[in-house]
């Protein structure tokens, strides 16, 4: 058997712990991966089944309920002293007998704690009290989970084949009883578009960003070669939602030598609140039409082409080509590049999300290079950071 021994896993944990203490890149993720491997090596099959089909589904359902009754907010408000079951029952409106059972499972799953007759929040549960995480909980439970639950029946009915790339006949449509694509459904089903954007805003929270030190060399590859006589635009975020990535970029490199431009669907741009302090321009743009901003230093996309099949992904990339200044403009794709030999959980998680919602997939390096080549571009380099699922693919005109 190729399964790692408990001894070798423990050795890996010891090494990763030392790296973590020294704040080495990827140490936290390595510790988590080794810890998961240890559990897998120690669990007997019955424990694995109970954990997979009882513990985790119950946990996600309780957390979704907790979002409805503001449980984590109340626990956070009681920081230090904690809150007993009767008082928490009064604040949440959940019967004390039921609440005690639900909360005990959260304690068993290390989400909250119980000490001296009172429930206490943790760093994790306090974080989950924030609005963007509350929205994320609702999105993942209400939208994603039913799509995963549909896998067995859907794939049985279609003969265990990959869904068509139309995006209108997959597990998501079967689960939500709709003929709309995932994105169309979000736009038409309030408030899930807002929840989705909140989820995307926290998707990489706490992880290294593409423009952080040690990831992509922004100053060397982007800013140092900026030429305002070619274009006064430094970076165009194509399909950038509400501008979370541009905000991060601006906060790290201001003052910038040129403009930042955000592009997304008209509905998304229209939903953005007015903000005079915003450091970028927000404009509506359809990614299936030619890029209107010409000769910018860079055109950036975060998790955009991965939501489409090869044909559409090539069209999206090709629409950038006429706007590029040869030898100057760069195309930057912040995407998962799946390792065929050592896939990490964060990458396969997103691949399953793509399968469930959009009938598409995360791509390997060879598959990404094919997309770029077919669009008239060439990959210059692929930048990665230890423990981070997404890479930064830099390309230019072929």
UniProtKB/Swiss-Prot annotation:
Question: What SUPFAM superfamilies does the record tag this protein with?
Answer: S-adenosyl-L-methionine-dependent methyltransferases, Winged helix' DNA-binding domain
Q: Which domain of life is it from?
A: Eukaryota
Which positions bind S-adenosyl-L-methionine?
264
Catalytic activities: (4E,8E)-10-(4,6-dihydroxy-7-methyl-3-oxo-1,3-dihydro-2-benzofuran-5-yl)-4,8-dimethyldeca-4,8-dienoate + S-adenosyl-L-methionine = (4E,8E)-10-(4-hydroxy-6-methoxy-7-methyl-3-oxo-1,3-dihydro-2-benzofuran-5-yl)-4,8-dimethyldeca-4,8-dienoate + S-adenosyl-L-homocysteine + H(+)
Give the transmembrane region(s): none
Q: Which biological pathway?
A: Secondary metabolite biosynthesis; terpenoid biosynthesis
Compartmental location:
Cytoplasm, Cytosol
Catalytic residues?
306 (proton acceptor), 335, 362
Q: Which terms does the UniProt entry file under GO BP?
A: methylation; mycophenolic acid biosynthetic process; terpenoid biosynthetic process
Keywords, in A-Z order: Cytoplasm, Methyltransferase, S-adenosyl-L-methionine, Transferase
Q: Which family does it belong to?
A: Belongs to the class I-like SAM-binding methyltransferase superfamily. Cation-independent O-methyltransferase family. COMT subfamily.
From the Swiss-Prot or TrEMBL record, give the protein name. O-methyltransferase mpaG
Q: Which gene encodes it?
A: mpaG
């Amino acid at each position: 058997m190729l399964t790692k021994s408990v001894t070798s896993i423990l050795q890996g944990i010891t090494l990763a712990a030392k790296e973590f203490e020294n704040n080495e890149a990827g140490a936290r993720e390595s510790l988590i991966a080794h810890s998961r491997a240890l559990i897998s090596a120690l669990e007997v099959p019955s424990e694995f089944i109970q954990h997979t089909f009882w513990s985790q589904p119950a946990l996600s359902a309780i957390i979704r309920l907790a979002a409805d009754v503001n449980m984590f907010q109340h626990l956070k408000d009681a920081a230090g002293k904690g809150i007993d079951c009767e008082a928490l029952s009064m604040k949440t409106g959940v019967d004390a007998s039921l609440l005690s059972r639900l909360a005990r499972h959260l304690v068993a799953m290390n989400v909250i704690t119980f000490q001296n007759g009172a429930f206490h929040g943790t760093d994790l549960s306090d974080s989950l009290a924030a609005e963007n995480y509350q929205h994320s909980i609702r999105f993942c439970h209400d939208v994603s989970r039913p799509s995963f639950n549909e896998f067995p029946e859907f794939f049985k009915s279609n003969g265990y084949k990959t869904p068509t790339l139309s995006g209108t006949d997959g597990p998501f449509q079967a689960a939500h009883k709709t003929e709309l694509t995932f994105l169309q459904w979000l736009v038409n089903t309030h408030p899930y578009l807002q929840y989705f954007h909140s989820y995307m805003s926290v998707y990489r929270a706490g992880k290294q960003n593409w423009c952080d030190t040690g990831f992509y060399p922004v100053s060397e590859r982007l800013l140092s070669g900026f030429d305002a006589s070619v274009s006064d635009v430094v970076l165009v975020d194509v399909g950038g939602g509400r501008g979370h990535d541009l905000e991060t970029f601006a906060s790290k490199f201001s003052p910038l030598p040129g403009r930042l431009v955000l592009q997304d669907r008209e509905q998304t741009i229209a939903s953005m609140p007015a903000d005079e302090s915003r450091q970028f321009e927000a404009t509506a743009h359809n990614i299936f039409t030619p890029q209107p901003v010409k000769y910018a230093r860079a055109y950036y996309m975060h998790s955009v082409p991965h939501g489409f099949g090869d044909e559409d992904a090539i069209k999206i990339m090709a629409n950038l080509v006429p706007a590029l200044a040869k030898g100057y403009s760069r195309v930057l794709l912040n995407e998962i590049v799946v390792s065929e030999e050592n896939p990490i959980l964060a990458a396969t998680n997103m691949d399953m999300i793509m399968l469930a919602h959009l009938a598409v997939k995360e791509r390997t390096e060879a598959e990404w290079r094919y997309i770029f080549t077919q669009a008239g571009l060439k990959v210059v380099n692929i930048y990665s950071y230890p423990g981070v699922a997404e890479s930064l693919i830099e390309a230019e005109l072929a």
